[in-house]
Amino acid sequence: MSKTVFTYQNVLRAYYNCRKRKRRTLSALGFECNLEANLAHLTQALQTRTYVPDRSVYFVVTKPKPREIFAAEFLDRITHHILINEVEKIWEKQIFLPHSCACRKRKGHHYAMRYLSQQIKNFAYFGQFDITNFFSSIDKDILYSLFCQVIQTQHRPSWWKDDILWLSQVIIFTDPTKGYFY
């Protein structure tokens, strides 16, 4: 068998990461009813590159203000975690600003407050922005091109780069607003 990022062990690790906050959702419970077969099927679909993301779940939240949410199904979240597990360290070292705190390990509210309390003693500016439809307005071609540039510069085997670029392309170019369900 050829080398691949999409091993059963990596899929299982991504599953455990994914279920930390989603374990009680209907999608996660359904997935766990036939866990081993579902993990094996996902592993095979990724290895043969036949994986296709499922439809998104659509709902509206009202706090802090009304907004539409298109959430990935549990199985698709596992694939997101596979990708994150592989590229997170690269992003941490090369891409993210040191004072960006959103969705980063060891950079939660406490880190942000400590950083802000240190910086407030100097002349500092701070901004919190909520851009309407931010994620849906990102140019996916540009995003994927930037992603490719970063991955191609890594000192990793070509099979790793091929797997990561294929999965990132599938995820980036999936439109969650098409074929969603309530």
Give residue ranges: language-model regions.
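Short, compositionally biased low-complexity segments
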Residues: 5-21, 53-58, 85-91, 121, ...
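Active-site-proximal segment of RNA-dependent polymerases
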Residues: 1, 8, 84-140
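Short, conserved non-catalytic motifs in the polymerase core
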Residues: 21-29, 54-78, 95-106, 172-182
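Non-catalytic, polymerase-adjacent accessory regions of viral genome-replication enzymes
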Residues: 1-40
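Conserved polymerase palm-domain catalytic core
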Residues: 45, 118-182
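Short helix-loop boundary/capping segments at the starts of domains
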Residues: 20, 24, 37, 41-52, ...
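Reverse-transcriptase-like RNA-dependent polymerase core
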Residues: 11, 42-65, 78, 120, ...
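Active/ligand-binding-proximal structured segments within catalytic/core domains
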Residues: 78-84
